[in-house]
């Protein structure tokens, strides 16, 4: 198989994640779906197998060559894995998942779905999630109907769903004018790579409707509320100096360059929480955050960021160097990028 096979085609940018692990960068996001009833693993596994027929470009695994990682078709059966919520851990792409670069798990009334960032982004993976959940509900006997929002079994796969969105930027140049030149950010060395101590997970839940209604009442977006609140907490814990907390924010490029692709198609922008925000009312901080985002999310700036990052990652992936050296170089590129800012949202 070659990368000309549309089922094996992936994007220019996210190949960088093939050369990283959980020890170098967060590359396996988790989606948590809370159900009304206890999850039925047999019906869930059946749903995953059905969804793979609709999303055949998700039937991937990765294998090393002397100079790079490459994708190949995965013909193994799909699996769903029991979670205990505490100690059981699985490795995506290993025998745990039969080599698949995504994971589906369950615990009591909760379904967990994770993916390796080299094959998708959050917006793209949501399409696969919707199909799995829709099929699961059907398999359980619920009278669900597709209102057109699900790429279900009543629709056909298109090669554009595995398109490399960044190819739309080829042979084009964009200006970096107006991109905020960030200063040194606040960091938290005690929770970075190599720090002693176990992983800390904190979960905060609330109705999205309440967040949406509040944000609308003061004329901002939900992100303009959530992001500064998280940065304020980070500043309270690790800041207190004249340095800003800076969060990395992923931006979906599909509204700018429409595509059906479920592959990785984002760029990142930097969002600060300035020291002077400490003395301002929250509403004012939220409004200033909205204004900053509006200024930094101009089309030209976003496409410049996207092309620069994708070109750099593609060049490294295609470089003729031993795999061990390429892994080391890719991990340095990734960790240097992440450590420029305080944390990633």
Enumerate the predicted regions with their spans.
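Acyl-thioester-dependent acyl-group transfer interface
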Residues: 1-68, 76-103, 236-345
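Non-catalytic, low-complexity flexible loops and terminal extensions
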Residues: 2-14, 110, 119-127, 131-213
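Short flexible/disordered coil segments
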Residues: 30, 119-134, 212-224, 301-323
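Acyl activation and transfer enzymes in specialized metabolism, enriched
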Residues: 36-52, 114-130, 200-239
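Secondary-structure transition/turn motif
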Residues: 72-77, 115-119
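Elongated alpha-helical scaffolds
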Residues: 105-109
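Short, well-ordered alpha-helical segments in soluble proteins
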Residues: 132, 136-140, 234, 293, ...
């Amino acid at each position: 198989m070659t990368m000309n096979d549309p089922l094996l085609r992936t994007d220019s940018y996210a190949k960088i994640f093939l050369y990283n692990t959980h020890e170098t960068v967060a590359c396996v996001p988790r989606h948590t779906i809370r159900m009304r009833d206890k999850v039925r693993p047999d019906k869930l596994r059946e749903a995953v197998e059905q969804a793979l027929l609709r999303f055949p470009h998700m039937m991937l695994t990765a294998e090393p060559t002397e100079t790079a990682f490459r994708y190949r078709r995965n013909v193994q059966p799909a699996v769903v894995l029991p979670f205990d919520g505490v100690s059981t851990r699985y490795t995506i792409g290993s025998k745990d998942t039969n080599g698949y670069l995504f994971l589906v798990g369950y615990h009591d009334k909760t379904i967990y779905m994770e993916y390796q960032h080299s094959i998708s982004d959050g917006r793209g993976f949501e399409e696969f999630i919707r199909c799995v959940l829709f099929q699961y509900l059907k398999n359980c006997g619920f009278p669900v109907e597709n209102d057109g929002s699900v790429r279900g079994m009543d629709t056909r796969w298109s090669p554009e769903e595995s398109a490399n969105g960044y190819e739309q930027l080829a042979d084009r140049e964009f200006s970096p004018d107006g991109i905020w030149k960030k200063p040194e950010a606040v960091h938290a060395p005690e929770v970075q790579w190599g720090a002693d101590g176990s992983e800390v997970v904190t979960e905060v839940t609330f109705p999205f409707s309440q967040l949406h209604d509040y944000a609308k009442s003061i004329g901002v977006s939900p992100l303009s509320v959530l992001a500064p609140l998280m940065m304020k907490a980070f500043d309270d814990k690790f800041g207190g100096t004249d340095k800003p907390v800076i969060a990395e924010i992923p931006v979906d490029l599909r509204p700018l360059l429409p595509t059906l692709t479920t592959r990785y198609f984002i760029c990142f922008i930097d969002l600060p929480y300035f020291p002077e925000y400490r003395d301002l009312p929250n509403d004012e901080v939220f409004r200033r955050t909205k204004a900053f985002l509006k200024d930094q999310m101009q089309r030209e700036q976003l496409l410049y960021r996207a092309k620069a990052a994708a070109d750099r990652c593609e060049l490294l992936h295609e470089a003729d160097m031993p795999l061990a050296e390429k892994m080391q170089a890719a991990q340095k590129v990734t960790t240097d990028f992440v450590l420029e800012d305080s944390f990633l949202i």
